[in-house]
C-alpha cells in the first residue's frame, strides 16, 4: 500500500461515519420476514464472532511480542474481517429480530447497563482508530502504529469481550 495520509484520512473518517450512521438508522428499522429460522440466531453468531475476535486479538499480541510479524499481520487482518462480518450480522439481527429486554433486577441490572453502555460507546468510538492503526501498519509506519495500538488494542479487546458478556447476561 502506498502512503497517502490525506486519502486515508478521508476514507477512514468516511467509512467510520457511514458505519455509524448505518447502525443508528438501521437499528430503528424493522423488517418482518419469515427466514425459516429464529433471527435471534444472529445474537448467538455475534457472540461467537466477538469471542473469536477477542481470542485473535490475544493471539495477535502474543505473536507481535514473539516477533512473528507476518503471523501477527494475518491474525489482525482476520480480526478486522471478522469484525466486518460481525457488523453485517449485528445489523441483520436488529433489523429482523425484536429487542431482548434484560430482566435482571438490583445491582446486576446496574452492572449489565454499565457494561452494555460502555460496550456500545467504545465500539462506536474505536472504529476509526482501528482503521488508522491498520493503515499505519500497512504503510510500514510501525512507530505510529504502535502508538495508536497502545490505546486502541485494549479498547477493541474490551469491546470484543463485553460483547460476549452482554450476550450471556441476557
PLM features per residue range, with description:
Residues 1-170:
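Alpha-helical membrane insertion/targeting regions
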Amino acid at each position: 500500500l502506498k502512503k497517502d495520509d490525506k486519502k486515508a484520512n478521508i476514507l477512514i473518517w468516511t467509512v467510520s461515519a457511514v458505519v455509524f450512521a448505518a447502525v443508528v438508522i438501521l437499528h430503528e428499522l424493522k423488517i418482518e420476514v419469515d427466514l425459516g429460522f429464529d433471527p435471534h440466531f444472529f445474537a448467538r453468531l455475534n457472540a461467537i464472532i466477538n469471542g473469536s475476535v477477542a481470542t485473535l486479538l490475544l493471539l495477535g499480541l502474543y505473536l507481535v511480542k514473539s516477533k512473528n510479524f507476518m503471523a501477527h499481520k494475518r491474525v489482525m487482518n482476520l480480526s478486522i474481517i471478522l469484525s466486518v462480518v460481525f457488523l453485517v450480522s449485528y445489523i441483520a439481527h436488529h433489523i429482523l429480530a425484536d429487542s431482548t429486554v434484560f430482566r435482571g433486577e438490583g445491582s446486576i441490572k446496574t452492572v449489565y447497563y454499565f457494561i452494555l453502555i460502555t460496550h456500545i460507546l467504545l465500539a462506536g468510538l474505536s472504529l476509526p482508530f482501528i482503521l488508522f492503526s491498520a493503515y499505519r501498519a500497512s504503510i510500514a509506519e510501525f512507530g505510529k502504529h504502535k502508538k495508536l495500538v497502545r490505546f486502541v488494542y485494549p479498547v477493541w479487546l474490551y469491546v470484543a469481550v463485553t460483547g460476549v458478556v452482554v450476550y450471556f447476561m441476557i
